Curated annotation (Swiss-Prot):
Region (Flexible linker): 143-150
Domain III as annotated region, ranges: 151-206
Naturally occurring in which organism (per UniProt): Corynebacterium urealyticum (strain ATCC 43042 / DSM 7109)
Tagged with keyword DNA-binding: yes
Subcellular location as annotated: Cytoplasm
GO molecular function: ATP binding; four-way junction DNA binding; four-way junction helicase activity
The protein's name: Holliday junction branch migration complex subunit RuvA
InterPro entries tied to this protein: DNA_helicase_Holl-junc_RuvA_I, NA-bd_OB-fold, RuvA, RuvA_2-like, RuvA_C, RuvA_C_sf
Amino acid sequence: MISSLRGDVIDKGLDYVVIECGGVGYRCLATGDTLATLRRGESAFVLTSLVIRDDAHTLYAFSTSEQRETFGILQKVSGVGARLAMGVMSVLQPADIARAVEEGDIKTLQQAPGVGKRLAERMAVDLKGKFPALEATSGQATIGDIAATGNDTALQSQVVEALVGLGFTEAKAATAVKKILEEQNGTTDPSSVLREALQRLSGQKR
């Protein structure tokens, strides 16, 4: 089991990072919060979780133990796999998830991509009391420090690819991203576009 990595960041995208350890590059999926703490060419340390499936072995990277713990707890709910858990964590902080579960705040949970009313209700019931170690704090890193590209086409493709990876259709993702880029003329921050697209597309699902 690979539980952490320490090495140089040799590549980074909108939803992944590659860390070289001992001459081997490990590709890890991560949320914007974790990616915001990493810089290409610099040394890094991340906590990891290895998810093994029949068709793939996937590493997920986290900058805090709270993030990794939340990732594991979310998957205890029937119907919530690693991809959906990361989708939830891409728009909600661990403390916000814990608070929403304890208070039965279904609407907050529904902000996450792929989480409808029924699943949100199941999460609130099944996970209640499972977050005792998470404090309701707001001092964690926020999305917005990911390296940007100055080309709208490249930015759009990058965000659309991330949305498709989270379960949205390419057509819906492309339409949403295009509209956001038109409204936010001149933006070069893919993470802010991704967050806005997630909120809009999740709202459409509800």
